[in-house]
Amino acid sequence: MVLTLLYVGRREGLGHERTRPTTNAGYEPGAREKWMRILFVHPEGNLANNPNLSAIIELLTRSGHEIIVRSARGNFARHENPNVRVLEVRYRIQRKLMQLSCHPRKWFLGKLLITLVPPMTPPADLVVGVDRQGLIEGAVIARSKGIPLAYWSYEIFFATECSSDFKALERREASSVRFAVAQDDLRARLLSEETGIPNDRILRIPVAGTGTRPAARTRYLNERFGIPADRRIAIFAGSVDEWTLARPLVESLPLWPENWVLVMHHRYGYVSDWQRSARHRMPSRFYLSEDSFPTIEGLGHMLHGADLGIALYNPTYDTPWTGRNIANIGMSSGKIATYMQYGLPVLINELGEISSHVREKGLGAVTGDVLEIPGILYHFDPESMRGRCLAFFAEHLDAKLYLPDLQRALSTAVAT
């Protein structure tokens, strides 16, 4: 529940002051607290499908801060909390901004689009740019309003994998950020090397939502797809592009134990031709979900009906997104974290820090090759791992664990 707060005044400096209503249990009557109006610039527009960013915004809102999100227009740009204000940028404008950000000499046109074309940005205390594009656009807003800038990095773009023009504006604007966020020590070091942001200014916050979702294994998927009750169900959620190894995984199905089946679910309900063909060839082994859920919570019904969550990452080096960024994914997989949040054991490949945790803490299995998966499944006991997955999420991944450090960084940025 988000508390309603009464504005009682403003002052220069750190945030503003409000008084909590005396009827709110757990707070001192008339207690005053500092709060901030924080603007997140998130051009990608998929807030509803980013479990970490959604959770962070929810937690900051519950803490009394006012949150505004500037994002590309679309159904997935909105936050489920009605108190989070979303400034929707028309698709045509957002696409143009992305094009211009790759040409530093033309970026003055991007600045004009941001400052003169709706939506107009209200006053704020601090801007958080999400990923490269959010940093570049957020810097324009922060500079125009004379407020500090922070950088939340989910993707790392390497100079060796993209053009100098593509990196130029990111490097320039990164020089003015008060702090940044990466997911683990390795990604923080790489982000520092690629942007020039000092490593000691980078917080470590894994990609994960907040709150475990324990539940007994349901028959949701069995009933949804007509899967026999004696089958164990592996689910593969998310993109099926080449870097996910989705196609080799499906091709390995004839070698799986007879009591295992695979369900694939794309976040937006997309189904490719090769998937339809595979379903036609293996109707009793391979099932496709064409549902599209407006929030991460909708996916939970599917995860509670599965026995295993599969997440595979294989760098293809054909775009700046799918090279070293994928090779060093570490603790930045929201898919793996979401599986564990729902008590679902995981099957992953060699991904750095998260793979070590899975091995050492008994959270599932780690494979070096898709062809090893059938052998792993013959001896896999998911029920013994569910509790450990929930505990690991609660103790290491939950976004609320990192809220105190984040709030200190926000307060320091605004105060200096």
PLM regions: where:
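N-terminal subdomain of nucleotide-sugar transferases
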Residues: 1-78, 247, 251-257
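Conserved donor-binding/catalytic core segment of Leloir-type glycosyltransferases
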Residues: 41, 227-244, 249-253
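Membrane-proximal helix-turn-helix segments that form the acceptor-binding/catalytic region
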Residues: 114-118, 136, 151, 156-183
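Active-site proximal beta-strand in glycosyltransferases
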Residues: 126, 140-159
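A short, active-site helix/loop in glycosyltransferases that binds the activated sugar's phosphate group
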Residues: 175-202, 209-213, 352, 356-360
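A charged, aromatic-enriched C-terminal amphipathic alpha-helix characteristic of glycosyltransferases
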Residues: 206, 368-371, 381-412
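A short helix/loop element that forms part of the nucleotide-sugar donor recognition site in Leloir-type
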Residues: 213-227
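Nucleotide-activated donor-binding/catalytic signature segment of Leloir-type glycosyltransferases, i.e.
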Residues: 274-308, 318
